Regions:
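Nucleotidyltransferase catalytic core that binds NTPs
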Residues: 1-176
Length: 176
């Protein structure tokens, strides 16, 4: 019988690599996301970057485009980073792919409130998957995909906020 003090299954010894899921809409991926992914690799053997389909958002880039843009960010880390997508529950996707943790980046206290509630719900749904919060690096704390899209749409300078190939893709999207 589970008591509040029983160790969750994620604490038990697991064979194989320590895998974490890093979910998001990534519309588009930013240097802030990349910072979280690279720092996550210091904690986990593999990161599954998971593009989440969110019916409440209308993405600028298609699912395939977002996955391709992410893949292009990590040519040197093919063995440690993989990209997938889901329209289901993230915590179920994590369990199905052997992930022991979900990584979430926090920019501000307002992010924490939402993310904390989400982490508690995920724990209720699947105790074997933990949530790990990583603070966004100071360089990227103000960056959001929405802000970058708005700046790009108005021909603002977004260089240094996203990888060069993402900047080109945004310029191309808004040139149409």
């Amino acid at each position: 019988m589970d008591t509040p003090f029983d160790l969750p299954p994620s604490c038990e010894s697991r064979p194989g690599p320590a895998i974490a899921l890093y979910p998001g809409t990534f519309d588009p991926i930013t240097n802030g996301h990349i910072d979280i992914i690279r720092r996550g690799l210091c904690l986990f053997d593999r990161i599954l970057v998971t593009v989440a389909v969110n019916d409440q958002k209308t993405p600028l880039f298609s699912l395939a485009e977002r996955c391709a843009l992410i893949n292009e960010c990590f040519p040197d880390l093919d063995d440690r980073i993989s990209v997938g997508a889901t329209d289901g529950l993230i915590v179920q996707y994590a369990r199905q792919h052997g992930a022991r943790a979900i990584i979430r980046g926090l920019r501000a206290i307002s992010d924490f409130d939402y993310e904390f509630q989400l982490a508690l719900m995920n724990r209720r749904l699947e105790r074997s998957v933990e949530t790990v919060f990583l603070m966004t690096g100071f360089r990227w704390i103000y960056i959001s995909s929405t802000g970058i899209k708005n700046a790009a749409r108005l021909q603002g300078n977004i260089s240094g906020l996203v990888p060069a190939h993402v900047e080109r893709a945004l310029v191309e999207k808004f040139a149409r």
